[in-house]
């Protein structure tokens, strides 16, 4: 089975980073000020914290890959170069994950290009999950609980 793992809101705490830096728009509630994010460049992404429970869960998923139980990939959407660079820097600083297995697409919907009957996507957003499922892939919605998410992965492996 191929397991594709989102980054923002799944592995890394995007909301905490935006909040810590005060990068919310003043004119619209709960909207990110992308001009500020882009002005900060790669550092915005590279300096994010792990989301609660993600570091241990990621280590378990990597161990499962080493045992040949699954193929693990990062599948993250970002539409500007400094964001891609920052996400790569984050992976290099915080993991031993091979950058060749990190895939970056422009839009969340583009993740559906990787959908297949043996492919699973863990993501926190419907705008990524729904197109992936519609394209024939399998989805696990991340709801902030890595223990439950890992249980869902193990359950999915037993189905294959």
Predicted feature descriptions by range:
Residues 73-82, 88, 96-113:
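A short, structured active-site edge motif that brings together acidic residues
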Residues 48-50, 54-91:
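Substrate-recognition element of Asp-dependent hydrolases with the DxDx(T/V) motif
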Residues 120-153:
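Acidic, Mg2+-coordinating phosphoryl-transfer loop and its flanking beta/alpha structural elements
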Residues 12-14, 20, 68-72, 81-85, ...:
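Short catalytic/ligand-binding loop motif for oxyanion handling, primarily in non-cytosolic enzymes
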Residues 102-132:
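Conserved Lys-Pro-Asp/Glu-containing loop-to-beta segment of HAD-superfamily phosphomonoesterases
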């Amino acid at each position: 089975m191929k397991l594709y793992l989102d980054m923002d809101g799944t592995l890394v705490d995007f909301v905490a980073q935006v909040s810590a830096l005060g990068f919310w728009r003043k004119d619209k509630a709960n909207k990110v000020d992308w001009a500020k994010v882009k002005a900060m460049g790669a550092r915005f992404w590279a300096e994010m914290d792990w989301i609660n429970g993600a570091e241990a869960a990621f280590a378990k998923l990597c161990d499962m890959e080493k045992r040949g139980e699954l193929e693990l990939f990062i599948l993250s959407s970002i539409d500007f170069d400094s964001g891609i660079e920052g996400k790569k820097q984050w992976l290099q600083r915080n993991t031993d994950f091979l950058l060749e297995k990190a895939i970056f697409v422009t839009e969340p919907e583009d993740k559906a290009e990787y959908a297949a009957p043996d492919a699973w996507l863990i993501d926190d957003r419907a705008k990524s999950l729904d197109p992936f499922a519609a394209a024939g892939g399998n989805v696990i919605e991340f709801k902030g609980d890595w223990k439950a998410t890992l249980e869902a992965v193990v359950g999915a492996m037993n189905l294959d």
